């Protein structure tokens, strides 16, 4: 999906669910990591996370677009556009837009595991973060630690 297709999709969703046109720019922002999309208050543009489209498809993207359009139309009309505002929550329910998007699964962060073993008592420590073996010792016997397995 390219920039023109996403612009067309946002305009169609705006007319279909809100009955009002979307008169600004919609685009993908590949730098977004943890959020599905964002509405920019100063320019009234909408930025969407391309990775959500890759992972979950068009249906999830339409939900994110509806959520951001709720911010857009409420802000344009001068009503409460923030997540905590009653107007925003009511409009979300009316257009069946999700309040939160699905959780982004980051495979590379979950896989990395370090296994350390004490050289004296052979106690094993499983860690997600790497530790400095010159600085840290075994908590049981104060023996030296050795990295035995690193999975990534």
UniProtKB/Swiss-Prot annotation:
Cofactors: Zn(2+)
Tell me which residues this entry annotates as catalytic: 68
Q: Which UniProt keywords apply?
A: Cytoplasm, Metal-binding, Zinc
Please give the Gene Ontology molecular function terms for this protein. Answer: zinc ion binding
Q: Which Pfam families match?
A: SprT-like, Zn_ribbon_SprT
> What's a GO cellular component annotated to this UniProt protein?
cytoplasm
Q: Where does the UniProt entry say this protein principally localizes?
A: cytoplasm
Cofactor binding note of this UniProt entry: Binds 1 zinc ion.
A GO term (biological process) for this protein? response to stress
Q: Which InterPro entries match?
A: SprT-like_domain, SprT_Zn_ribbon, Uncharacterised_SprT-like
Q: Where in the cell is it found?
A: Cytoplasm
Q: Which SMART domains match?
A: SprT
Which amino acids does the record list as binding Zn(2+)?
A: 67, 71
Which residues does the UniProt record annotate as the domain SprT-like? Answer: 7-148
Please verify whether the record's keywords include Repressor: no
What family classification does the UniProt entry report for this protein?
A: Belongs to the SprT family.
Its name, as the record gives it, is Protein SprT-like
Taxonomic lineage is: Bacteria, Bacillati, Bacillota, Bacilli, Bacillales
């Amino acid at each position: 999906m390219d920039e023109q297709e996403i612009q067309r999709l946002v305009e169609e969703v705006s007319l279909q669910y809100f009955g009002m046109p979307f008169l600004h720019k919609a685009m993908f922002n590949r730098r977004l990591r943890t959020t599905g999309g964002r509405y920019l208050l100063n320019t009234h543009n909408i930025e969407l996370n391309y990775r959500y489209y890759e992972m979950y498809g068009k249906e999830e993207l339409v939900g994110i677009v509806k959520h951001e359009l709720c911010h857009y139309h409420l802000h344009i009309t001068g009503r409460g556009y923030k997540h905590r505002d009653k107007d925003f929550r009511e409009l979300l329910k009316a257009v069946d837009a999700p309040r939160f998007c699905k959780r982004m699964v980051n495979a590379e962060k979950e896989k990395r595991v370090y296994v350390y073993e004490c050289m004296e008592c052979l106690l094993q420590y499983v860690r997600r973060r790497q530790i400095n073996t010159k600085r840290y010792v075994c908590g049981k016997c104060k023996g030296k630690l050795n990295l035995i397995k690193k999975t990534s």
